[in-house]
UniProtKB/Swiss-Prot annotation:
A matching Pfam family: HMG_box
Motif 9aaTAD: where in chain: 326-334
InterPro entries attached to this UniProt entry: HMG_box_dom (IPR009071), HMG_box_dom_sf (IPR036910), Sox_C (IPR021934), SRY-related_HMG-box_TF-like (IPR050140)
GO cellular component: nucleus
PANTHER family noted in UniProt: SOX TRANSCRIPTION FACTOR, TRANSCRIPTION FACTOR SOX-17-BETA.3
Domain of life of the organism encoding this protein: Eukaryota
Sequence segments annotated as region (Required for transcriptional activity and interaction with ctnnb1): 327-331
Keywords attached to this entry: Activator, Developmental protein, DNA-binding, Gastrulation, Nucleus, Transcription, Transcription regulation, Wnt signaling pathway
Gene3D superfamilies to which the protein is assigned, alphabetical: High mobility group box domain (1.10.30.10)
Gene name as annotated: sox17b.3
GO MF annotation terms: DNA binding
The protein's name: Transcription factor Sox-17-beta.3
Record's function text: Transcription activator. Doesn't appear to bind to the consensus 5'-AACAAT-3' DNA binding site, but binds 5'-ATTGTT-3'. All of the sox17 proteins are required for embryonic endoderm development and gastrulation movements, and show some redundancy in function. In addition, the sox17 proteins have distinct but overlapping roles in later gut development. Acts downstream of vegt-signaling in endoderm differentiation to induce a range of endodermal genes both directly and indirectly. Also represses wnt-responsive genes to inhibit wnt/beta-catenin-mediated signaling.
Length: 376
């Protein structure tokens, strides 16, 4: 019968020997314990070299505190074995400060003797402080996050210049588009000038400063479009223009409105509102006949203001010569009048409109031209 292992290891099992050392005898086998012993000897040799380097380094001479703390630290360590070295140093510092000069004198003399001896032993000694490796590592890490100095040359400046040029081109294109097309809500975000402001006394500059949002004056194209929209939007009210014969009827209706108790509420509602040259009339005021007459006259006055801004200088000089200088005194005093009294002056004898309104319109047009186009 054949053996179960095929006759390969029958002799080894009988004699109790392994065939691996015989087959691989050419390789060197080492004991694991010898490896650890070799590592231990190398470590001891390295520590001996480090000790030799430390001993080769010249130490500084001890001062008086070090001479005193040399023996005192050992005593405190024996009394308080659980304390850390930092706590021992704090205790030594406090106790050294509490000592008197007489008790410190022997330690000071010993430190002076050691210093003289150190100078004699090492005449070429120069104190070199230890380098702080941790601070150096932190500096290197911080320098890794900072950009290099080479990038701060003309390349970066060129990139910044290109970015600035692109931004300027884009911004100029946006400004040109905005100047060509006026937004729909351009005249909607401004506070109205109604009953509490007198148009001939308060300039647009100061009214814009008092308002919540300040906006620059419109361009010339916007001003022309404004005048066109103004004329086209108030055509129905111009058709209802009153004749001089309607003056007395309007005066009677005005007295009725002033005597009514609802005049305090309707005074501000019926008054037209001005938005940077546009006249805004409330819905409740469109049905009232007196309000329609006021709308027509106020629109006519605003149209005269716009057209007088473009008159030649010769015509302006001719019109300014006709201004009565004493008439401006009445504008300096504020009198709470109704809107009809501010807009109209009716001759009681003839019932027709007086022509004293022309100088005030001229002065108002000049002030509008000065504040809108001179940039004050």
């Amino acid at each position: 019968m054949s053996s179960p292992d095929g006759g390969y290891a029958s002799d080894d099992q009988i004699h109790g020997n392994c065939s691996v050392p015989i087959m691989m005898g050419q390789y060197e086998w080492t004991d694991p314990l010898t490896m650890f012993q070799d590592a231990k000897t190398k470590k001891e040799a390295g520590s001996a070299n480090s000790r030799g380097k430390a001993e080769a380094r010249i130490r500084r001479p001890m001062n008086a505190f070090m001479v005193w703390a040399k023996d005192e630290r050992k005593r405190l360590a024996q009394q308080n074995p659980d304390l850390h070295n930092a706590e021992l140093s704090k205790m030594l510092g406090k106790s050294w400060k509490s000592l008197t000069l007489a008790s410190k004198r022997p330690f000071v003399e010993e430190a002076e003797r050691l210093r003289v001896q150190h100078i004699q032993d090492y005449p070429d000694y120069k104190y070199r402080p230890r380098r702080k490796k941790q601070v150096k590592r932190m500096k290197r890490e911080e320098e890794g996050f900072l950009p290099s100095a080479n990038l701060a040359g003309p390349q970066v400046m060129g990139c910044n210049a290109m970015v600035g040029q692109n931004y300027k081109m884009q911004y100029s294109g946006q400004n040109s588009q905005q100047s060509q097309i006026t937004p729909a809500g351009y005249f909607e975000d401004h506070n109205p000038v109604g009953y509490y402001y007198r148009g001939y006394n308060v300039s647009k500059y100061y009214m814009s400063q008092n308002s919540s949002g300040y906006c620059s004056p419109p361009a010339q194209g916007e001003y022309q479009a404004l005048s066109y929209n103004f004329n086209s939007s108030y055509m129905p009210y111009q058709q209802n223009a009153s004749t001089p014969a309607m003056g007395k009827q309007m005066a009677v209706k005005e007295n009725i409105i002033q005597e009514s108790p609802e005049h305090g509420i309707m005074g501000c509602q019926v008054s037209p509102q001005m938005y940077n040259g546009q006249m805004y009339v409330p819905e409740c005021a469109k049905t009232h006949p007196v309000a329609q007459t006021e709308q027509h006259s106020s629109s006519h006055q605003s149209q005269q203001m716009v057209t007088q801004n473009y008159l030649p200088s010769q015509q302006d000089g001719h019109l300014e010569s006709d201004i009565d200088k004493t008439e401006f005194d009445q504008y300096l005093m504020y009198e709470p009048k109704s809107d009809t009294e501010l807009i109209y002056t009716i001759d009681q004898d003839s019932g027709a409109y007086s022509t004293n309104l022309l100088p005030s319109l001229i002065s108002e047009a000049n002030s509008v031209c000065y504040y809108d186009y001179c940039g004050v």
